[in-house]
Amino acid sequence: MLRVNSKSSIKTFVRHLSHKELKFGVEGRAALLKGVNTLADAVSVTLGPKGRNVLIEQQFGAPKITKDGVTVAKAITLEDKFEDLGAKLLQEVASKTNESAGDGTTSATVLGRSIFTESVKNVAAGCNPMDLRRGSQAAVEAVIEFLQKNKKEITTSEEIAQVATISANGDKHIGDLLANAMEKVGKEGVITVKEGKTLEDELEVTEGMKFDRGFISPYFITNTKTGKVEFENPLILLSEKKISSIQDILPSLELSNQTRRPLLIIAEDVDGEALAACILNKLRGQVQVCAVKAPGFGDNRKNTLGDIAILSGGTVFTEELDIKPENATIEQLGSAGAVTITKEDTVLLNGEGSKDNLEARCEQIRSVIADVHTTEYEKEKLQERLAKLSGGVAVIKVGGASEVEVGEKKDRYEDALNATRAAVEEGILPGGGTALIKATKILDEVKEKAVNFDQKLGVDTIRAAITKPAKRIIENAGEEGAVIVGKIYDEPEFNKGYDSQKGEFTDMIAAGIIDPFKVVKNGLVDASGVASLLATTECAIVDAPQPKGSPAAPPAPGMGGMPGMF
């Protein structure tokens, strides 16, 4: 029999769970600031060409060695709950910048720390935090507008390689390989980075449309040496439904025989007498035919079949449109220059669909990607479809002597890939923090327009913050940051900055030291947004720590195997 729980034990349990700790005003902000500084110190050592690596203990396997800011930020958890709260908010800055731009997380962390530090000082001195925030937001908008006017569009393969090299911490091999991949698959092509199985990095490019479904039966193989089906100029029958009846494929087989062209059937499935007829025709040598299952599931399958139809100039046979494969005509069948099918995947090359229809389909997919309601997963799938239609797919297989080396190099490849995409999308600026230093000159106008003293301090907060990334890059190279930042500021030419690798002043864009505009913009917006909100915090609430020696949580009375059963 189960004993009834006492009310007092339930009260104790609830009270235990609801115990919180609070800190107000200056005390709360000081604790948050300490956490922000701890995280920023760890992340900022990786900044610039002479930045250092960070070694991170992993729960499983070998330790991870990395120079990727967001990886370092995510690895940090602090013991003091209030400090950890500050660190978590700065992690949010790095994560947001990583999601939106894919790079620039270390710079965003340095900016966030600087804005928050200055704001905390000003609030402690009696400034209105809301006015400080208004001033800093106005300054950020002015800086972005200035950078927008001075950015340079990226056009050549050399410039793409330069962007990738900078983001890969000066590794020219990574830059060249990514530029090569982008040249082959186009700006919208999919480039994926995977861990390879050799010592060298490899680039594998698939042009045309590739999907992960192979032949239904090995009887269709035309090249026994390679185990592949290879067709030249085939007809393509596309069906949304399963094909079982011989009547469904008879017209298509006859058309294939008459035109002396191979036939590729892509359907939900092909079985029964339809599959038997296909195999029999193939074995007798009457018709070259192959059946493949359509890729994906549900709506994704429907969309992919639609894409293949647009690419090949065919029609998808579907019950919705009341067109059946048993009535197929030559106009309804698609065609392609060549098709290669293995047991795992199918590649269609040189589809003969209309270029206008193809461009319209790509535009439709782009508009869905741009829609705010589209989820990240859907965007990823749409981006893949767009790549297959417009360019191709490139896979970079990262090689190395050990798991740790491959993991570190893969991080740099992904950073470089994101930075390159951002540069191609929105243009480039002189790198090494140079563009932000030049932007400080326009903040005098913004300061004059500020309606009160506190807003002017907000503008000054941004003015001080945007010099910090360059200062940190220079200091990581062992130079005197403040002196060199002053010299960059005095230099009238927008592109003139300091090359920390060589220790000389130079035209940054000509030297290939560049930052994507999107990365700089998103880093500044994310950092100022979170940091100025942090400064307006008046109360911080955390779960109170457990007293030493007490159990983590009292067991709920009357649970199976616990006291209360008899």
Swiss-Prot record:
This is Heat shock protein 60, mitochondrial. Keywords: ATP-binding, Chaperone, Mitochondrion, Nucleotide-binding, Stress response, Transit peptide. It comes from the Eukaryota. NCBIfam families: GroEL (TIGR02348), PRK00013.1 (NF000592), PRK12849.1 (NF009487), PRK12850.1 (NF009488), PRK12851.1 (NF009489). InterPro entries: Chaperonin_Cpn60_CS, Cpn60/GroEL, Cpn60/GroEL/TCP-1, GroEL-like_apical_dom_sf, GROEL-like_equatorial_sf, TCP-1-like_intermed_sf. It is found in: Mitochondrion. Residues 546-566 are annotated as: Disordered. Belongs to the chaperonin (HSP60) family. The keyword Chaperone applies. May participate in assembly and/or disassembly of proteins imported into the mitochondrion. HSP60 are ATPases and have affinity for unfolded proteins. It holds the Pfam family Cpn60_TCP1. GO terms for molecular function: ATP binding; ATP-dependent protein folding chaperone; protein-folding chaperone binding. One of its GO terms (biological process) is protein folding. PROSITE patterns: CHAPERONINS_CPN60. One of its GO terms (cellular component) is post-mRNA release spliceosomal complex. Coiled coil: none annotated. The keyword Transferase does not apply.
